[in-house]
Amino acid sequence: MTSKNKSILDDLLSDEPIFNSNEEEDEVLKPLLDEINMIDNLNIKLFTRSVLLQAKMFWVIPSSFSGKYHPPDEHNGGGNVLHTKRVVRAAKVISDSYSLTSSERDLVFSACLLHDVTKGVGDESCSDPTSFTYDPLHPYTVGNFVKKCQENDRKYTSEANSSTLYIDEETVQSILRLVRCHMGPWSPVPETVPVTYLDMIVHLADNMASKLHYIVDGDNVLKERWILESQ
């Protein structure tokens, strides 16, 4: 058997799905591809990709709907994506300090990428990015959205080729637990404040990213600097 044939056979016998990057999907995910590719486990990576691809509002809403919170360069359309990128990067720094295992990092990075996918409520066609409103319960509605993604996969693809169905339910729930804890002491449901160190890492990464302008500038935030640097 040639090495090429052996490689093909190994892929077919593997527990992981065979993944060939889709250029059209990659174009949609381009702003977050570096962060998505920080996930080592292919099943978790494909699951995360699939949910992000189906979260149309996620890509067009700002990170702050009132303009009172988050860095000024996140206040317009697409700001939620920039915030998410910063959350994952902050999580990586904290994960390095904790010397997390690869499997722990994958859960943290996936949760950070998905933590705000249902933050905005509005027109699902995304025809008017200004029409969205903030969902204060978004840490919990992510779970319902994931179920919807799984239902879509059942309708349109086989389980063997599905991005969301291939992942085991225990892993999904571990990721969703971290998502539910990302608001920390400001959680709308007290029962989901961070308890474990993974819970806390996701919360701290989100909190630090949302206060990045204060970390850099202090109380006197130089809005011009943030707006100019984002252009």
Question: Where are the regions that the model predicts?
Answer:
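Divalent metal-dependent catalytic cores for phosphoryl transfer on phosphate-bearing substrates
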Residues: 67-83, 89, 94-221
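Acidic/His-rich, divalent-metal-binding segments that scaffold phosphate/diphosphate chemistry
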Residues: 2-126
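Polar low-complexity intrinsically disordered regions
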Residues: 1-14, 27, 151-164, 230-231
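A glycine- and charged-residue-rich anion-binding loop/surface
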Residues: 217-231
